[in-house]
Design a protein with these regions (language model features):
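Domain-level detector of nuclease and nuclease-like folds
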Residues: 33-36, 43-181
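Long, non-catalytic terminal segments
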Residues: 1-51
Length: 181
């Protein structure tokens, strides 16, 4: 299992010139290895939305039909969210859960792969603290890498936890883990 210390050690050992651009490969390897250790039948694909104008990439498990991480350089989005499309996305997790965004629309998230069952009080509570910080960084044009990783405890599409992280230049980390139950 990855911890805040794992990320801090990776960041501390980085010796390049552009941590935001160059650390992604190491992070993807860590995320894939961590997920595969608990899900040996995983069939992971990378869904890179940069060609469509987004700055985000998603790792998705085809076998269990779930996103395992969303990451990228956040952008300050000013266009309105397509609430009709979001309303059409299934919400089978119960009344206490929202169709939560891994990456908030206001910082570049917006596709169906980005929606996931998220406890309502988390979605409008503690999860927003780091989202707001990232939105402000995006508004300022700060170059950072933002990631959100749903952590699953079984084969369902319901995450047990969410891990949020922001890697900033030169070598710093903002980090939080949230319970989703």
């Amino acid at each position: 299992m990855l911890t805040e210390g794992t990320y801090r050690n990776l960041i501390a050992s980085y010796r390049g010139k552009n941590i935001v651009a160059e650390l992604t490969g190491s992070l993807v390897a860590l995320w894939c290895d961590d997920y595969a250790a608990a899900n040996p039948t995983a069939d992971l694909v990378s869904v890179d939305l940069r060609e469509s104008g987004s700055t985000l990439t998603y790792l998705f498990d085809i076998h269990l039909q779930r996103t395992i991480v969303a990451y990228g350089v956040p952008v300050f989005a000013t266009n309105p969210r397509d609430s009709g499309r979001m309303a059409g996305h299934p919400n089978s997790a119960g009344q206490d859960y929202h169709r939560g965004h891994l990456i908030a629309h206001s910082i570049g998230g917006g596709t169906d792969i980005n929606l996931i069952p998220q406890l309502g009080k988390l979605n409008i509570g503690h999860f927003r603290i780091l989202e707001k910080r990232v939105r402000e960084l995006a508004r300022q044009g700060s170059n950072c890498l933002y990631f959100v990783r749903p952590i699953y405890s079984n084969a369902s599409q319901m995450p047990a936890q969410f891990e949020q992280g922001v890697i900033l230049r030169p070598k710093s980390l903002l980090y939080a883990v949230h319970q989703n139950s």
